[in-house]
Amino acid sequence: MSCQSPIVVALDYPTMAQSIEMAKRLDPEQCRVKVGKELFTTAGPVILDELHKLGFEIFLDLKFHDIPNTVANAVCVAAKAGVWMVNVHASGGRRMMEASANALQKLPDNKTLLIAVTVLTSMDQSDLIEIGIDATPEQHVKRLAALAKSSGMDGVVCSAQESSMLSAELGKDFVLVTPGIRPAGSDQGDQKRIMTPVEAMAAGSHYLVMGRPITQANDPIAVLTQANADLGLMA
């Protein structure tokens, strides 16, 4: 049964054993899980198989950014591995994104969502200026998100602060995936643009990525259950 919750728990662990241990403390009916660079690099594709065996839908968060053919092949491999969602960097440009979208469309019965990363939530305007982009994060997100949609992406990763703007400009069916989500009162960590789950959904986000507030809690399933209850789910 497909997960009805918008919450995606980030399994940001250095070993497969730790990630599987945490996954076993969660409920695939209450969340999806995200596999990022550290975990995938140490564990390899086998981590996807193990999480699928536990019943989880997986967001493979590798942020591909390379020449069009390389990225197109990579997202196809991810889709064939059965991941629910995979992402690429919008800054890779139109040809890279179009090649990826077209490659997935050619796969029989493909259901993998293809999402573009806009501006990392750890970045602020000073970071953009340092890499030669004379724009606010909001302006650059808007530019990259529009490019992503016109290039065939299913949606983008963006901060909750940009969700309302993007939903209004690009349509409510354009999927918005929001990291930097933390329950009220949580430590901000290294995310500079954050919101609570309720605030993010109200702003137009479709999926909410949560990491340490759940994975470092004494009772992760209790925090997850409460977050879903706050959203009017599984109360």
From Swiss-Prot:
PROSITE patterns to which the protein is assigned, alphabetical: OMPDECASE (PS00156)
Reactions catalysed, as given in the entry: orotidine 5'-phosphate + H(+) = UMP + CO2
Superkingdom of the organism of origin: Bacteria
Residue positions binding substrate: 12, 34, 61-70, 121, 182, 191, 211-212
Protein family (similarity comment): Belongs to the OMP decarboxylase family. Type 1 subfamily.
Function per UniProt: Catalyzes the decarboxylation of orotidine 5'-monophosphate (OMP) to uridine 5'-monophosphate (UMP).
Protein name (Swiss-Prot/TrEMBL): Orotidine 5'-phosphate decarboxylase
Source lineage: Bacteria, Pseudomonadati, Pseudomonadota, Gammaproteobacteria, Oceanospirillales
